[in-house]
């Protein structure tokens, strides 16, 4: 649906909640609002923006690392050093053990999630207008962390690391004992313990992904509602205060995702 053809707030809101999707069965764009009966559909917009932001993050940090100086740093180098020191202090205080992977992983998670969240502050009609006018795309959403597929994919990666370090540190037998001998250390409760621990284990990636998705989706929805329901001359008085408050949410959600990643991996890396 073209932006020019949207005639009421309901259509406007519905249009901005549609992803740019491609059907892998015929490699054609899915019409906005159409329900596809099979699984093989990709949200192209979320994938593209998340990859672009990831490459942007890597290029900035790589450029600063190549030009780093021991003298008085410039503004960008000073900012990155502050972020690095912040991440390192959190890892030291929360991760019980020594693992050279945890700090870089935490830095990547924090900055990448923050950049994805930050896209929520861009005016919601900007990229859809450009994509429709110049590329004839039927829909476009630009906040990857407001797509449950992206957030659950990231949490799935964390979950795989949890399983890897649990087996590595405790051994396969030790990991199985952890699932069956807690909280009641008796053979009678093996099945009961396993069910409890399985729910606890699976709830970590699910809650990690859903928490980020829920907060960012609701924030994006408020921006869409303001733009769709209010006249243009009054939107400023709600958009600006909400955007200022949303900066806190953006930063906080990136921090929470990073902290829980560190905590979960710390728990998995304990040998007992």
UniProtKB/Swiss-Prot annotation:
<dbReference type="GO" id="GO:0046933">
    <property type="term" value="F:proton-transporting ATP synthase activity, rotational mechanism"/>
</dbReference>
<comment type="subunit">
    <text>F-type ATPases have 2 components, CF(1) - the catalytic core - and CF(0) - the membrane proton channel. CF(1) has five subunits: alpha(3), beta(3), gamma(1), delta(1), epsilon(1). CF(0) has three main subunits: a(1), b(2) and c(9-12). The alpha and beta chains form an alternating ring which encloses part of the gamma chain. CF(1) is attached to CF(0) by a central stalk formed by the gamma and epsilon chains, while a peripheral stalk is formed by the delta and b chains.</text>
</comment>
<dbReference type="Pfam" id="PF00119">
    <property type="entry name" value="ATP-synt_A"/>
</dbReference>
<keyword id="KW-1133">Transmembrane helix</keyword>
<feature type="transmembrane region" description="Helical">
    <location>
        <begin position="143"/>
        <end position="165"/>
    </location>
</feature>
<comment type="similarity">
    <text>Belongs to the ATPase A chain family.</text>
</comment>
<keyword id="KW-0138">CF(0)</keyword>
<keyword id="KW-0812">Transmembrane</keyword>
<feature type="transmembrane region" description="Helical">
    <location>
        <begin position="188"/>
        <end position="208"/>
    </location>
</feature>
<keyword id="KW-0813">Transport</keyword>
<dbReference type="InterPro" id="IPR045082">
    <property type="entry name" value="ATP_syn_F0_a_bact/chloroplast"/>
</dbReference>
<keyword id="KW-0472">Membrane</keyword>
<dbReference type="InterPro" id="IPR035908">
    <property type="entry name" value="F0_ATP_A_sf"/>
</dbReference>
<comment type="function">
    <text>Key component of the proton channel; it plays a direct role in the translocation of protons across the membrane.</text>
</comment>
<dbReference type="GO" id="GO:0005886">
    <property type="term" value="C:plasma membrane"/>
</dbReference>
<protein>
    <recommendedName>
        <fullName>ATP synthase subunit a</fullName>
    </recommendedName>
</protein>
<feature type="transmembrane region" description="Helical">
    <location>
        <begin position="222"/>
        <end position="242"/>
    </location>
</feature>
<keyword id="KW-0406">Ion transport</keyword>
<dbReference type="GO" id="GO:0042777">
    <property type="term" value="P:proton motive force-driven plasma membrane ATP synthesis"/>
</dbReference>
<keyword id="KW-1003">Cell membrane</keyword>
<dbReference type="InterPro" id="IPR000568">
    <property type="entry name" value="ATP_synth_F0_asu"/>
</dbReference>
<dbReference type="GO" id="GO:0045259">
    <property type="term" value="C:proton-transporting ATP synthase complex"/>
</dbReference>
<feature type="transmembrane region" description="Helical">
    <location>
        <begin position="110"/>
        <end position="130"/>
    </location>
</feature>
<dbReference type="InterPro" id="IPR023011">
    <property type="entry name" value="ATP_synth_F0_asu_AS"/>
</dbReference>
<feature type="transmembrane region" description="Helical">
    <location>
        <begin position="41"/>
        <end position="61"/>
    </location>
</feature>
<feature type="transmembrane region" description="Helical">
    <location>
        <begin position="243"/>
        <end position="263"/>
    </location>
</feature>
<keyword id="KW-0066">ATP synthesis</keyword>
<keyword id="KW-0375">Hydrogen ion transport</keyword>
């Amino acid at each position: 649906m073209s932006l020019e053809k949207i005639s009421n707030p309901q259509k406007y809101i519905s249009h901005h909640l549609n992803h740019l999707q491609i059907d892998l069965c015929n490699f054609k764009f899915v019409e906005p609002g159409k329900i596809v009966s099979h699984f093989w559909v990709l949200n192209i917009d979320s994938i593209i923006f998340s990859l672009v932001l990831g490459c942007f993050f890597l290029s900035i940090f790589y450029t600063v690392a190549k030009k780093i100086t021991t003298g008085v740093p410039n503004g960008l180098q000073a900012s990155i050093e502050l972020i690095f020191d912040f991440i390192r202090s959190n890892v030291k205080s929360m991760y019980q053990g020594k693992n050279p992977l945890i700090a870089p992983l935490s830095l990547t998670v924090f900055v990448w999630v923050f950049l994805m969240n930050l896209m929520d502050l861009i005016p919601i009609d900007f990229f859809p207008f450009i994509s429709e006018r110049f590329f004839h795309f039927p829909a476009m959403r630009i906040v990857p962390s407001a797509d449950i597929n992206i957030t659950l994919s990231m949490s799935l990666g964390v979950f795989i690391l949890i399983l890897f370090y649990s087996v590595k540190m405790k051994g396969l037998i030790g990991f199985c004992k952890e699932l069956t001998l807690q909280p009641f250390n008796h053979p009678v409760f093996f099945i009961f313990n396993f069910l409890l621990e399985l729910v606890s284990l699976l709830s970590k990636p699910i809650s990690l992904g859903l928490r980020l998705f829920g907060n960012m989706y609701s924030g994006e929805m408020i921006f869409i509602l303001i733009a769709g329901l209010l006249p243009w001359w009054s939107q400023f008085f709600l958009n600006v205060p909400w955007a200022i408050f949303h900066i806190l949410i953006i930063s906080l959600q990136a921090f929470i995702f990073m902290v829980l990643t560190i905590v979960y991996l710390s728990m998995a890396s304990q040998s007992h």
